């Protein structure tokens, strides 16, 4: 394990967080599942990391009480769902960046992850790859602007494009990146 990773793990612990290191996706999945009681209610923020390690599928397919926002069909129901998520026993998320000083850096469009981390469930589990480790808060902000926001913009543009109706146009500049989400779809 690299010195940077070790320093970051120790800094997270010094900041009163439990910190674990996993060699691979399966080990990460097993570690997270070991931290969740089977009878706990579980909610999560939108996170590719959680999907990539197989956590969302494991929760859905192995009897966990997982509250899945993908089940929401009407966008008007999202605010109520986000509020409900704050009452779950466990909240799962990732972070946009983690500093070597053990600081979690998050920028959210809906503030659901940040709200859950600060005011939500007693148990919040953050799953993040070592690619998210940065030196300090300045590098964290830069990572959001140059890596996380552009990737999320592309991912969310595809999702939005699949849900809009003819004539709908959605334009949003994400974090001043100059990358606009423009979603429109013709049903023809």
Report each predicted region and the residues it spans:
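Conserved phosphate- and dinucleotide-binding cores of soluble alpha/beta proteins
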Residues: 86-188
């Amino acid at each position: 394990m690299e010195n940077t990773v070790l320093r970051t793990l120790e800094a997270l612990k010094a900041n009163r967080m439990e910190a674990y290191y996993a060699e691979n996706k399966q080990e990460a999945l097993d570690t997270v599942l070991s931290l969740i009681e089977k009878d706990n209610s579980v909610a999560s923020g939108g996170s590719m990391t959680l999907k990539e390690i197989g956590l969302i599928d494991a929760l859905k397919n192995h009897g966990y009480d997982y509250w899945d926002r993908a089940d929401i069909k009407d966008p008007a129901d999202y605010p109520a769902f986000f509020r409900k998520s704050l009452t779950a026993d466990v909240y799962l998320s990732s972070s946009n960046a983690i500093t070597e000083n053990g600081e979690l850096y998050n920028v959210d469009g809906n503030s659901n992850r940040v709200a859950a981390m600060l005011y939500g469930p007693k148990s919040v589990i953050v799953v993040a790859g070592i690619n998210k480790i940065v030196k300090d808060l300045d590098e964290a902000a830069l990572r959001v602007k140059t890596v996380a926001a552009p990737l999320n913009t592309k991912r969310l543009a595809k999702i939005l494009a699949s849900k809009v109706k003819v004539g709908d146009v959605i334009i949003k500049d994400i974090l001043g990146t100059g990358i606009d989400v423009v979603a429109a779809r013709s049903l023809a």
